[in-house]
C-alpha cells in the first residue's frame, strides 16, 4: 500500500484555480522572508456577537494517488511533521492562548458537490490527539455554527483559493473561514509579538495605504476580523499590514501598524515604514529590522 502523504495547500487564482497566485518573481513573499518565525491557521468569528471562536483549523491536503485513509496516530503525526516541521509550535501557541487547535485533512480531488465527501479532523489536545471523520455536510454545519449563522462570500468574490474545497464552498452559505497570514512569535519563548497581514501590490508605483481599501468598504470585514483576533490573543500586540510588490520592476514594501475592529468603525494607521528590495531581492535581516521597529 502506498505511503500516506500530506502537502500544504497552494494558493491559486480565482474559483477555477487556473494558475498559481502571483508573488514577486525574484524576491518572493513575506511567507518566505519570515519562514520559521510565524504560525498560521484559519479561524472563525461569530458575527452574531463579534467574538473570535476558540477553534483553529490548519488545513493539509492528502496527496492524490496515495492511501487516502489516515493511518494510526504515530504515522499520521509523522506525516504532518514532514510537512510542517515543528507542529508542536502551533499546538503550543494555541493551547497557551485558550484556543482549540485542529488539523483538517482531506483529499481535494473529491467531488465537493457530494455532501458525503470525507474529511478528517485531528484535534491537538494538551496530552494527546483525537482523529474524527466528518462528511462535507457536517463540516458545513460546523462552519455555520462557529460563524454564528450562514456566511457567504463578499462582493469582491473569491480571488485566491487554497483548495478546490474552498472554491466550492464559496458558492454556498458555508464559506470556509479566513486565515491569519502570520502570528509573529518571539524566538525561544514563542511569545506572540504581532499579528501580520500580507497584501499584494499589483499595480505600478508606490503601494497604497490599506486605509483606502478599508474606507471603501471592500476589505472592512477582513481587517475587522484580524483586529478581533489580535484582541483575543493580546490587546497589547500590534497588527502590522505588509504590502509587497509582485511586479518585477517594483521594489517598495510598505509596513503599516493599524487599529480597526467592529467597535471602532474605522481603521487608523498608527505608524508606517518602508523597506526596499535591492536588485530584485529582499535583504531578510533588513526586512526583519524594519518590522521589529514597529513592535
Task: Please give the residue ranges for each predicted region.
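Acidic-basic catalytic patches of nuclease active cores, encompassing PD-(D/E)XK
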Residues: 1-50, 93-100, 106-178, 293-295
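Acidic, metal/cofactor-coordinating or nucleic-acid-engaging core segments within structured domains
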Residues: 82-85, 153-167, 172-175, 205-247
Amino acid at each position: 500500500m502506498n505511503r500516506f502523504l500530506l502537502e500544504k495547500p497552494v494558493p491559486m487564482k480565482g474559483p477555477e484555480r487556473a494558475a498559481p497566485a502571483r508573488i514577486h518573481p525574484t524576491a518572493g513573499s513575506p511567507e518566505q522572508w519570515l519562514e520559521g518565525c510565524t504560525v498560521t491557521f484559519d479561524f472563525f468569528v461569530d458575527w452574531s456577537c463579534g467574538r473570535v471562536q476558540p477553534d483553529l483549523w490548519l488545513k493539509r491536503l492528502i496527496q492524490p494517488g496515495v492511501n487516502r485513509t489516515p493511518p494510526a496516530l504515530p504515522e499520521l503525526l509523522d506525516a504532518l511533521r514532514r510537512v510542517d516541521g515543528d507542529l508542536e509550535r502551533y499546538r503550543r501557541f494555541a493551547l497557551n492562548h485558550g484556543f482549540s487547535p485542529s488539523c483538517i485533512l482531506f483529499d481535494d480531488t473529491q467531488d465537493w458537490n457530494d455532501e458525503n465527501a470525507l474529511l478528517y479532523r485531528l484535534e491537538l489536545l494538551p496530552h494527546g490527539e483525537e482523529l474524527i471523520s466528518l462528511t462535507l455536510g457536517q463540516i458545513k454545519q460546523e462552519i455555520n455554527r462557529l460563524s454564528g449563522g450562514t456566511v457567504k462570500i463578499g462582493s469582491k468574490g473569491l480571488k485566491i483559493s487554497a483548495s478546490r474545497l474552498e472554491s466550492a464552498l464559496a458558492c454556498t452559505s458555508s464559506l470556509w473561514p479566513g486565515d491569519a497570514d502570520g502570528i509573529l512569535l518571539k524566538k525561544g519563548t514563542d511569545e506572540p509579538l504581532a499579528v501580520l497581514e500580507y497584501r499584494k501590490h499589483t499595480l505600478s508605483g508606490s503601494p497604497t495605504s490599506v486605509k483606502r481599501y478599508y474606507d471603501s468598504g471592500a476589505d472592512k470585514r477582513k481587517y475587522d476580523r484580524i483586529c478581533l483576533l489580535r484582541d483575543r490573543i493580546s490587546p497589547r500586540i500590534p497588527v502590522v499590514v505588509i504590502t509587497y510588490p509582485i511586479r518585477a520592476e517594483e521594489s517598495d514594501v510598505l509596513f503599516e501598524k493599524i487599529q480597526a475592529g467592529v467597535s471602532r468603525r474605522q481603521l487608523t494607521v498608527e505608524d508606517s515604514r518602508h523597506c526596499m528590495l535591492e536588485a530584485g531581492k529582499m535583504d531578510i535581516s533588513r526586512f526583519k529590522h524594519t518590522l521589529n521597529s514597529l513592535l
